[in-house]
């Protein structure tokens, strides 16, 4: 796993996408960022996060197992819920994170608004200075 921080953006490469994308197990891949981990980043000034995994949060398979044991509803979408305390945006299913260096570029995001939806896809572009 690799963590890249550039100004107020953090990318988390879990290797889920290049290894598992297109396979049935993709939704179970990735490390997942919990409430505390997400809040830690937000308290450091991060306002945009991204991952190559299916979700910012832990895969449903593991969340369901944990919920069946503890019946604690706070574990469901806990990384997402950190945004209630400190606002941020996150991107999921990012392709080609493994091709990016640790720094030296700017990220530009071009979201597609879907009427009535709370989320949509975006074109995330890395811009390198010459």
Residue ranges and their predicted role:
Residues 11-130:
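Active-/binding-site microenvironments in catalytic and ligand-binding cores
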Residues 1-15:
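Single conserved hydrophobic/aromatic residue that forms the stacking wall/gate
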């Amino acid at each position: 796993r690799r963590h890249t921080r550039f100004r107020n953006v953090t990318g988390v490469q879990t290797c889920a996408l290049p290894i598992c994308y297109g396979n049935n197990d993709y939704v179970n891949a990735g490390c997942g960022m919990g409430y505390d981990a997400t809040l830690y980043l937000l308290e450091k000034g991060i306002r945009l996060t991204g991952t190559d995994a299916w979700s910012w949060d832990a895969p449903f398979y593991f969340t369901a197992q944990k919920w069946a044991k503890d019946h604690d509803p706070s574990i469901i979408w806990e990384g997402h819920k950190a945004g209630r305390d400190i606002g941020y945006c996150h991107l999921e299913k990012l392709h080609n994170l493994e091709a990016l260096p640790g720094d030296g570029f700017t990220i530009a995001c071009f979201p597609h608004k879907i009427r009535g939806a709370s989320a949509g896809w975006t074109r995330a572009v890395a811009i390198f200075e010459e």
